[in-house]
């Protein structure tokens, strides 16, 4: 614009009334402008032409005289309304639409010089020279700046480009404000009117545009919406009618092209109209059909969503996975007591103390005792751990909360810890109560440093804090059940969290008898059924397996059309569980059947003539499960420990099948049927050497991880295992050579009857004949 040391502030508010008062006041009298007394002589302090005052001092004097109100109010040109009406009107119209902040109005152009009507202003006696002199004093001048002692008196305004900042602005202001043109070729009033059209472009805008008036913003928005609403109907109307004339013209043109007589033109138009109406009716019918189809699909969709939400399984899953605050509902176990638990008397006795505490806590607290916080049930699968927990809740008649360890953690981080908090919060609100966590090892496993699962420890940490943290949980008993107690974290199984650890073993003969009686009372069975005989033949069966045995017998009796369950059905179900289901549809040729008969009879001969081997239960060449034959061995009594002789006898029995094939068919015709037998024998020999300390060379030292041992030690272990297997093979070969006749008779009996029990095997080995079935 000007030199960078100049200060230009063209936005000046000069009310029109002040200008008129200044014109009417005599020369030697004072004028009041905005409440400030200013002498006219002071206004007429004109600087000689050869020494133009600086723009800075003149503008400062101008501000002092006129008492400027505010800069940028949108009224900069209002004081000169009478001098140039048309440009001022346009400027006022542009400025009235702006708000109270600085908005740059659009520049306008003055095509002709403004005309002065002094008569309307009452200034007919004033001369043009006086008016020019007065306006010249009122307007800021542009001249060379003075030397200023303080830099605070100078305002530096950045131009719109680096070129203007460095070299100055070469626009019309520089030309009009030069000394020669400004003083000799134009008057001040004419110059300012000519420059007025460029001033809005150079108005300095201060402030933040984000603080615009909300009222004006809403008003402008509503105006734009109104304009859009006014434009839209006319646009749509024009869009719809844009081709109507052409359609009419095309119809007339069509009639002319077809040379339709004028007498038939009306009929043509009528037919065209009828066809058009029919097409519209067809279109309307199609639209109605589509509308009905959409409505039907929408209703079906709503019913489908409603049905999914009402589905119990889906609703529960949705309920438990949508949020962290899943509801916890207690279950009353009034129909389950300790009478339903059979075969685990020691475990029942331990838990009855807890039930007594829940029923009568004062009996224990009066002596200073505290309720145990946690009870850990440990045992193999199917021994009744969950049933014991339900019996505790049923006997104590308290709320029972059930949760599985795998239900806590999901795909979201923090869900497991949140559900632990919700579970214990609900339990504390309903204390005294029982919380049963099944499969505790899935949530309470040992914590490890793993970068792959950094958040997996949150759930167990929350469980530890809830069980024995800063806040006590009086009246809440936690019962946990697991099949792998060695996998639990040490902080979880310490006293204070799980105070009691109850082992739930497999039932013994007495326990199996009680369990069989309990489940037999639920079905119809013959009086000849002896539960003790079945119990002796089901060594190692758990409570769940015994329940399955009775259920399979009932199903077999129903299939055979019997009214009661007999021993035959119970034996059938026992063999089905021990040896697998029969595969009678399999067709086996005589050669393979003969090999199988001699193979299975070899196992039976070794088991029968070895002193410490388990007694034979049944032998069969009927395909069962993955095998072509099977010999079932059952101990007469429960075995709590096994001797070295018993382990060697098991190895000898396993070797009997391959030895029989070698002796009968030769080494070139041995089969792969002995692979599982060798696996079993190798496992027994390896445990004898590495765990049981039954090797004379290696002694009683155990070797848990053979991969970390020295090559010499590994070689010694392998040598000892090889010796045990070789000796077992030789013993089995000696027995079969000694009892070759009995071996042959038993194989022929198996080929004839397919299945033989223990008594029938004994009859055959004694040289007697079996009764015809």
Curated annotation (Swiss-Prot):
Cofactor(s) it depends on: Zn(2+)
Alphabetical list of PROSITE patterns matching this protein: AAA
UniProt key word S-adenosyl-L-methionine: no
Protein's UniProt keywords contain Phosphoprotein: no
PTM annotation, UniProt: Proteolytically processed by mitochondrial processing peptidase (MPP) to generate the mature form. Degraded in an OMA1-dependent manner in response to oxidative stress.
Reactions catalysed according to its record: ATP + H2O = ADP + phosphate + H(+)
Example of a GO biological process term: mitochondrial protein processing
Cellular component per GO, a single term: nuclear body
Location relative to the cell: Mitochondrion inner membrane; Mitochondrion
SUPFAM superfamilies documented for this protein: FtsH protease domain-like (SSF140990), P-loop containing nucleoside triphosphate hydrolases (SSF52540)
Mitochondrial matrix membrane side: 1-295
GO molecular function: ATP binding; ATP hydrolysis activity; ATP-dependent peptidase activity; metal ion binding; metalloendopeptidase activity
Listed InterPro entries: AAA+_ATPase (IPR003593), AAA_lid_3 (IPR041569), ATPase_AAA_core (IPR003959), ATPase_AAA_CS (IPR003960), FtsH (IPR005936), P-loop_NTPase (IPR027417), Peptidase_M41 (IPR000642), Peptidase_M41-like (IPR037219)
Tissue and organ distribution: High expression in cardiac and skeletal muscle mitochondria.
Mutation effect (residue 439 to Q): Loss of ATPase and protease activity. Loss of PRELID1 degradation. Cannot restore OMA1 degradation in YME1L-depleted cells
Bilayer-crossing regions: 296-316
Active-site annotation: 600
Residue sites binding ATP per the record: 341, 383-387
Keywords: ATP-binding, Disease variant, Hydrolase, Membrane, Metal-binding, Metalloprotease, Mitochondrion, Mitochondrion inner membrane, Nucleotide-binding, Protease, Transmembrane, Transmembrane helix, Zinc
Disease with which this protein is associated in UniProt: Optic atrophy 11: An autosomal recessive disease characterized by progressive visual loss in association with optic atrophy. Atrophy of the optic disk indicates a deficiency in the number of nerve fibers which arise in the retina and converge to form the optic disk, optic nerve, optic chiasm and optic tracts. OPA11 patients also manifest delayed psychomotor development, intellectual disability, ataxia, and leukoencephalopathy on brain imaging.
Family matches, as NCBIfam families: FtsH_fam
Family classification: In the N-terminal section; belongs to the AAA ATPase family.
Designated name of the protein: ATP-dependent zinc metalloprotease YME1L1
């Amino acid at each position: 614009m000007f030199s960078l040391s100049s200060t230009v502030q063209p936005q000046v508010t000069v009310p029109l009334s002040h200008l008129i008062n200044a014109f009417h006041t005599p020369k030697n009298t004072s004028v009041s402008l905005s409440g400030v007394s200013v002498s006219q002589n002071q206004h007429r302090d004109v600087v000689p032409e050869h020494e133009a005052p600086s723009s800075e001092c003149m503008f400062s004097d101008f501000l002092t005289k006129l008492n400027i109100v505010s800069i940028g109010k949108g009224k900069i040109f209002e004081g000169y309304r009478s001098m140039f009406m048309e440009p001022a009107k346009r400027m006022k119209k542009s400025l009235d639409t702006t708000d109270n902040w600085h908005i740059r109005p659009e520049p306008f152009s003055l095509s002709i010089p403004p005309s002065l009507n002094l008569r309307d202003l009452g200034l007919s006696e004033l001369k043009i020279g006086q008016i020019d002199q007065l306006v010249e004093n009122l307007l800021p001048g542009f001249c060379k700046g003075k030397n200023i002692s303080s830099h605070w008196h100078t305002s530096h305004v950045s131009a719109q480009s680096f070129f203007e900042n460095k070299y100055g602005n070469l626009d019309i202001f520089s030309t009009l404000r030069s000394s020669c043109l400004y003083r000799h070729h134009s008057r001040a009033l004419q110059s300012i009117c000519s420059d007025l059209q460029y001033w809005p472009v150079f108005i300095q805008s201060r402030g933040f545009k984000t603080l615009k008036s909300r009222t004006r913003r809403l008003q402008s928005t509503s105006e734009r919406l109104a304009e859009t609403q006014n434009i839209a109907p006319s646009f749509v109307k024009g869009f719809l009618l844009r081709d109507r004339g052409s359609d009419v013209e095309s119809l007339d043109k069509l009639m002319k092209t077809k040379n339709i007589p004028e007498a038939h033109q009306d009929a043509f138009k009528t037919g065209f109209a009828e066809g058009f109406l029919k097409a519209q009716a067809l279109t309307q019918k199609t639209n109605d059909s589509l509308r009905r189809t959409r409505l039907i699909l929408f209703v079906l969709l709503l019913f489908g969503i409603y049905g999914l939400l009402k589905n119990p399984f889906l609703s529960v899953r949705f309920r438990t996975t949508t949020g962290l605050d899943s509801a916890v509902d207690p279950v009353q176990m009034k129909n389950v007591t300790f009478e339903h638990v059979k075969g685990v008397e020691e475990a029942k006795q331990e838990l009855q103390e807890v039930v007594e505490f829940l029923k009568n806590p004062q009996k224990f607290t009066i002596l200073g005792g505290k309720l145990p916080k946690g009870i850990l049930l440990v045992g193999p699968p199917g021994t009744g751990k969950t049933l014991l927990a339900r019996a505790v809740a049923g006997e104590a008649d308290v709320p029972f909360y059930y949760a599985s360890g795998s239900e806590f953690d999901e795909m979201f981080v923090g869900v497991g810890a949140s559900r632990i908090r919700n579970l214990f919060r609900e339990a504390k609100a309903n204390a005294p109560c029982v919380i049963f966590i099944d499969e505790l090892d899935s949530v309470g496993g040992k914590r490890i440093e793993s970068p792959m699962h950094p958040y997996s420890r949150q759930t167990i940490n929350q469980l530890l804090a809830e069980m024995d943290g800063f806040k006590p949980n009086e009246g809440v008993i936690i019962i946990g059940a697991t099949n792998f107690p060695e996998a639990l974290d040490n902080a979880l199984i310490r006293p204070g969290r799980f105070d009691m650890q109850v082992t739930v073993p497999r039932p013994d003969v007495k326990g199996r008898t009680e369990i069989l009686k309990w489940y037999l009372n639920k079905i119809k069975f013959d009086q000849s059924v002896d539960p003790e005989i079945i119990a002796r033949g089901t060594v190692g069966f758990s409570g769940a397996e015994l329940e399955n045995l009775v259920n399979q017998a009932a199903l077999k009796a129903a299939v055979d059309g019997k009214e009661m369950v007999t021993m035959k059905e119970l034996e059938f179900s026992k063999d089905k569980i021990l040896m697998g289901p029969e595969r009678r549809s399999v067709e086996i040729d005589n050669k393979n059947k003969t090999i199988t008969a001699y193979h299975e009879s070899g196992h039976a001969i070794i088991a029968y003539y070895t002193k410490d081997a388990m007694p034979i239960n049944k032998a069969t060449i009927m395909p069962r499960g993955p095998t072509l034959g099977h010999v079932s061995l059952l101990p007469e009594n429960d075995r709590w420990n096994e001797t070295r002789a018993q382990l060697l006898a098991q190895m000898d029995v396993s070797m009997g099948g391959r030895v029989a094939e070698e002796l009968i068919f030769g080494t070139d015709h041995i089969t792969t049927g002995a692979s599982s037998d060798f696996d079993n024998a190798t496992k027994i020999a390896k445990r004898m050497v590495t765990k049981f300390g039954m090797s004379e060379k290696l002694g009683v030292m155990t070797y848990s991880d053979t991969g970390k041992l020295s090559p010499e030690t590994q070689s010694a272990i392998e040598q000892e295992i090889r010796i045990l297997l070789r000796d077992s093979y030789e013993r089995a070969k000696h027995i079969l050579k000694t009892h070759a006749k009995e071996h042959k008779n038993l194989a022929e009996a198996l080929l004839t009857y397919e299945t033989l029990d223990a008594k029938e095997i004994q009859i055959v080995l004694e040289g007697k004949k079996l009764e015809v079935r």
